[in-house]
């Protein structure tokens, strides 16, 4: 199952609200925006978020440089995972109302990141509805030996444990996992990098 085809089917419902966590340069959000343009989106909002001021400034510049059609809007916003989930009031209205699709690439590099992200998703990812039966968080991470412990936290934090969660109506769990093997950036013959692709949603 390709990531592109999966995202396309999920994005082809309008209006559509998308959120990127740890956007960095904004490459993923801009690629999603182009995908939305290609399928004729007339009402799509993409919010690309990051924490570091210097990264956000570069993100804003990249968004401004990439002209998009009127039907697709990309904005950049500050988001601190470690504080957002327990804030009494959502300070920025852009985060109100929930998101249909959330995605993140290479954003797990500390032991608490998965926990913080799950807590944020519990407030930000839309609950299942007739219009959007399966809101999803798409996560891709490189499987680095140096970050094996941090990577393992994803399946621990988003585990489907029926005994613990049976009394809760909606719980975020890993619904799909795929290992993707790519050639390494070094260009050396035979050198490859493995990525884990997760689809996380409400049980």
Give the location of each predicted region.
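S-adenosylmethionine-dependent methyltransferases
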Residues: 1-203
């Amino acid at each position: 199952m390709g990531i592109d085809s999966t995202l396309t089917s999920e994005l082809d419902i309008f209006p559509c609200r998308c959120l990127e966590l740890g956007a960095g340069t904004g490459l993923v959000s801009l690629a999603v925006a182009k995908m939305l343009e290609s399928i004729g989106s007339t009402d799509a909002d993409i919010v690309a978020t990051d924490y570091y001021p210097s990264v956000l400034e570069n993100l804003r510049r990249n968004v401004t440089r990439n002209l998009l059609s009127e039907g697709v809007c990309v904005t950049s916003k500050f988001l601190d995972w470690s504080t957002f989930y327990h804030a009494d009031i959502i300070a920025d209205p852009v985060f109100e109302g929930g998101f249909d699709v959330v995605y993140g690439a290479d954003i797990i590099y500390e032991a608490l990141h998965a926990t913080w992200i799950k807590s944020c998703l519990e407030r930000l990812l839309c609950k299942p509805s007739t219009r959007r039966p399966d809101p999803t968080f798409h996560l891709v991470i490189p499987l680095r030996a140096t970050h094996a412990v941090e990577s393992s936290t994803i399946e621990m934090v988003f585990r489907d444990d029926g005994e613990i969660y049976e009394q809760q109506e909606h719980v975020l769990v890993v619904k799909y996992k795929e290992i993707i093997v790519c050639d390494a950036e070094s260009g050396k013959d035979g050198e490859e990098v493995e990525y884990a692709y997760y689809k996380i949603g409400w049980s």
